[in-house]
Amino acid sequence: MSTEDALCFTGEEYARHVREYWRGVAESDGFDSEDIRSPVVLTGLFHYDCQSGRRYPDPLLVKRYALLGLHRFNILQGTSFELDALQKFNKTMNLTSSYYITLLANEPGAIPLQKTFQVRVDERKYDTLDLTVAIARLKKDQNEAAETTKEPFVPHFCCSAVSDGVFQGPLPDWPSDDALRHDRNRFYELEKSEWQATDWISLYLELLILATDRGMFGVAQTGLPQVQILKVVIETEEENEKPLDKRLNARRAHVYITFTGLPKSPRLVEIGEHVERKAIIRRVIDDSGYLTLLGKFWSGKDTEQRSKTRQSEEKVESSQKRSRLC
């Protein structure tokens, strides 16, 4: 429908066309809506065919969103699917977007070898790693009843997994050396061979780097640097004394990564690939199956700034108490 036709809509007709469009999109939970035409300009989903050979936006990020969806599926189902290829994806027109990705993946020894997956990722903030995988599922074929979400379809969900304790609210500071040495039930430092065999650790770090540098000349457009991971510590619940494989797949965890190879980062003033940088990433998977990732680069200056803020707040509070006494 042309722009001129759209301008001839009455308010009631406009609302009706929009409702009909989103009703059609909702039938496939946003994944197979490319044949449904948006009735008006700037309404609807963008559609991209990853097999056409044409360029599409943020290919590095979209691929890692697909990998993150498979990661969630593997944790919850105890499988080991690996990404073969992206087929297509739809995305909302927001700056912070929701992505509906269709992909092919395989599991060694599985029959058939390739299976089609659907992954939905909702970004909560731009230029920050704050996102939720709301759907990660096998796509049903035409002879099977389609699996749908229980909630009403909302194009951009902006929801996160529910948590409590140390795994909710702002991300923590970097743990002290004393805590790392003595609180072994809570913190576990991975051996090099262990984190090298754990693909999702590098995936989380790559997502943080890409999410925080999405400008025209950022790494999301120019390419990921060759970072080198030096140290990985995983924090799980204090009473958690499970074996390593269970700890790595814990539904709630903080991952502390020390690395080099990033020329610059948004939060740190030091420039150079030689600089040791630190990243903190939280993973929460709740009972509904939502997987939320929240991450940041960390500097000791963050702690200093918070300390100064607390001192300032305490001075104000003390001054107010003295005023009331007078």
UniProtKB/Swiss-Prot annotation:
Biased composition (Basic and acidic residues): 301-320
InterPro entries xref list: MS5
Disordered: annotated span: 301-326
Cited Pfam families: protein_MS5 (PF04776)
Family as reported in the entry's similarity comment: Belongs to the UPF0725 (EMB2204) family.
NCBIfam families (UniProt xref): A_thl_para_3677
Protein name as annotated: Putative UPF0725 protein At1g28500
Source organism: Arabidopsis thaliana (Mouse-ear cress)
